[in-house]
Design a protein with these regions (language model features):
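Terminal targeting segments of Actinobacterial cell-envelope proteins
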Residues: 1-15, 40-42
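Hydrophobic membrane-insertion alpha-helices, especially the h-region
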Residues: 17-32
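Solvent-exposed, non-transmembrane regions of membrane-associated and secreted proteins
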Residues: 29-159, 170-172, 182-237
Length: 237
């Protein structure tokens, strides 16, 4: 259910960056599964989202906890929000993604867990972030490739453009409808934690996967592709 502004609680859940040492989504991927296939699509500069001077933090060594802005006051919240409910499925028509969502926690080194490389799907919701539709940036991650099926669930994430819809089905039988604000590709060693994980004044969503040219020597992708989206409405599942 959408919460009217006057009923939104001041003490909303802190964004991901407030609680844990997050920096990038792990990009030690298979690569070999894409041999003979073109590299994953990359977002053009025109698809970039504007962010006010985000703080960039090195991925290695582990960064110190970063500071986040105060949780927005009730009268500062922008747009609709939903009561908390865990996500169960994601649908992205523009890139033909329809995936159940697993739950992902945190690795000992502070990085976000990722789905198994042995499967192209599913994507996963990071449980340390708000549920989709709540105030703050909800985080959903997925692989770009896999060991057994080549292209994985977020292989085409770089194709997304502002205005594309993202539909997230939740456990309370509602569908949260998000619209893409922008798409960015960041080097792992210059990842803007504040812009991606910091508190927001609206119900946001981040879709994240690996990106850039696969390095045959290190067997890794050097970048992360991040899709920024905002909640615009909800409906019954």
């Amino acid at each position: 259910m959408i919460i009217p502004a006057e009923k939104r609680r001041r003490g909303s859940r802190l964004a991901t960056a407030a609680a844990v040492l997050l920096f990038t989504i792990g990009c030690t991927a298979t690569g070999f599964a894409l041999w003979g296939n073109p590299p994953p699509p990359r977002p053009p500069a025109s698809a970039a989202v504007s962010a006010p001077s985000p703080e960039s933090v090195s991925a290695t060594p582990l960064p110190e906890p970063i500071s986040v802005p105060p949780t927005p006051r009730v009268d500062q919240v922008v747009g609709p929000t939903l009561t908390a409910s865990e996500p169960t499925q994601i649908n992205v028509p523009a890139i033909e993604v329809d995936s159940v969502l697993m739950q992902l926690g945190q690795n000992p080194d502070g990085t976000v867990q990722t789905p198994s490389l042995d499967e192209a799907s599913p994507a996963g919701w990071y449980t340390g972030s708000p549920t989709p539709g709540a105030i703050g940036p909800s985080v959903i991650v997925g692989h770009v490739d896999s060991r057994v099926q080549g292209r994985a669930v977020f292989y085409r994430l770089g194709e997304m453009r502002p205005g594309d819809e993202i539909l997230v089905t939740r456990a309370d039988a509602t569908v949260a409808v998000f619209v893409v604000d922008g798409v960015e590709e960041y080097p792992k060693d210059d990842f803007p934690q504040f812009a991606v994980y910091g508190n927001t004044d609206h119900a946001g969503l981040r879709l994240i996967t690996c990106g850039g040219e696969f390095n045959e020597i290190t067997r890794t992708y050097p970048d992360n592709v991040v899709v920024y989206a905002s909640l615009v409405s909800s409906r019954a599942a």
